[in-house]
A protein has these predicted regions:
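An acidic/histidine-cluster motif and surrounding catalytic segment
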Residues: 1-110, 121-153
Length: 153
């Protein structure tokens, strides 16, 4: 299953469209189809700077400061009818800073956060420990299929 991915950039130093497409579609290779077979899944990815992420994080999560990735899934009934999954917001400066601080390849960190955000659009979460373990295991498997090392190691 190949997703329709709309990519919008308002940030510097972001991956190519082809990279986002590879990472998102790897998620669909490892998860049950989110839509009926005749409907392709569709999502948007927006790459932003610190100010926009700080504003969105405050408005929607009541948290101060920027975070690395936020996902905004649509209602599952709408997804089933239209294929729309939702939106992913990724903060480019946070991704770069975290990769540097954690000693990770920046493209690997972009891949991880894109996979993470896409899984949230599919209903995965990490609020409870068992959910977190399931989601992390799936992220590791997806990234491994892309020859990207375990981000939690």
């Amino acid at each position: 299953m190949t997703a329709a991915i709309h990519i919008d950039r308002d940030a510097e130093a972001t991956p190519a469209d082809e990279a986002f497409e590879l990472w998102v579609n790897a998620v669909f290779d490892h998860t049950p189809a989110p839509t009926p077979s005749e409907i392709s899944p569709e999502l948007s990815i927006r790459c932003v700077e610190l100010d926009e992420m700080t504003d969105v994080n405050s408005r929607f999560r009541q948290k101060a400061g920027a975070t690395n990735v936020l996902s905004f899934p649509v209602d599952p009934d709408l997804t089933e009818k239209t294929g729309l999954l939702g939106d992913i917001l990724i903060c480019a400066p946070v991704v770069t800073d975290e990769a540097e601080q954690q000693g990770k390849d920046v493209s690997h960190h972009w891949a991880h956060l894109t996979v993470h955000g896409t899984l949230h659009l599919l209903g995965f979460d990490h609020i409870e420990d068992d959910q977190a373990q399931q989601m992390e295991a799936l992220e590791i498997a997806i990234l491994n299929s892309l020859t990207i090392p375990n981000p939690y190691a």
